[in-house]
Amino acid sequence: MKEVSRVSKRLKVTSAVMAFGLVAALASTMPASAAAKKVNWKTVQSVADAGGLDALVAQAQKEGELNLIATPRDWANYGEAIDTFAKAFHIKVNSDNPDGSSAEEIVAIKTTKNMAKMPDVVDIGMSVLDDAAGLLAPYKVANWKDIPNSVKDPDGTWYGAYAGKMALWYDTSVSPAPTKITDLDNAAYKGMVALPGDPTAAQQALIAVMATSIANGGSAANVAKGVDFFKKLKANGNFVAVKGNASNFATGSFKISLGWDYNAIGYTAAAQKIGKTIKYVYPSDAHVQGTPYVLAINKTAPHPAAARLWEEFMFSQVKGKISKDLGANDYKKIKGAKMMAQIMGG
């Protein structure tokens, strides 16, 4: 959906989706007998176990659906990723609770009784990995060796996908324009400042508080000064108790928030559609690079092949076709490995 002491390290993880090359001929390298074997898709740990990429795609298409959770379209370009996956492989993508937190993703795995709605995969902050113990399926994507050891579980139960830098974003109608976090304690911002979620449940909000602590002379390890700052903003009426996201911004519920830079980019595009303008800056009093969000497969995924194909897709994009480039019937004409190669740009 963390290791707090590492938040200030500048991990070199791409801010959208890790872009690693996927070998287009992957399926053809598998033994001819592999595809003929009966496969338990819930325990498949690699494309080789699946009998090759063509076999994995075929089974995923047979399942026909993929259940995502907490993946809003304006977050890390998920909208385009979902559209491309659905169109390329003709798999229906269901997105539940798009604005949910990492903690809520784990709760959904633990408590969802209706298997049709059970999440197949999760995108969670490292801060909740302990809560996910025993819930995730080991699976190593084809590009496993290219993922830094520091951002993956050795057994393949999770792997870092993308990370961002903490930004301060705001409606351009705000005056004066904020340039640092401590600027937010200004009477001009009454009723304007929001956090991007609950810091006890959402990694983005947690690190926003850490950044605020740093800006006020504290540290990421001890966020007391960050908490005190937001208490002060609440007392003077600047802080509003709404989630700092695109939908609440559109209603005018707030005008200033902290959040990942890649989300600020997405919010900027969304705001333009409703006639508003957003700008973002990296606050001069807190330069904070986040550790990655990790992707993982639910051990009890109702669509286990589709879940594994999604992970292969997410770790394989380069500069190939996206949704607008794909013909509606491409998936009927092209086998799985070749389709993946087209998405990659091969």
Regions found by a protein language model. Give the residues of each.
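Extracytoplasmic ligand-binding site segments that recognize negatively charged/polar headgroups
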Residues: 67-83, 94-110, 116-253
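Short secondary-structure boundary segments
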Residues: 126, 197, 261-262, 326
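A ligand-binding cleft/hinge motif common to bilobed small-molecule-binding domains
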Residues: 127-133, 250, 255-276
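Short, low-complexity disordered leader/linker segments with a strong preference
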Residues: 1-63
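Mature extracytoplasmic/periplasmic domains
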Residues: 288-289, 293-346
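Short beta-strand->loop
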Residues: 136-145, 156-160, 185, 269-289, ...
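Short, polar/charged alpha-helical segment
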Residues: 50-61, 71-92
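Small-molecule pocket liners
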Residues: 164-167, 210, 278, 291-295
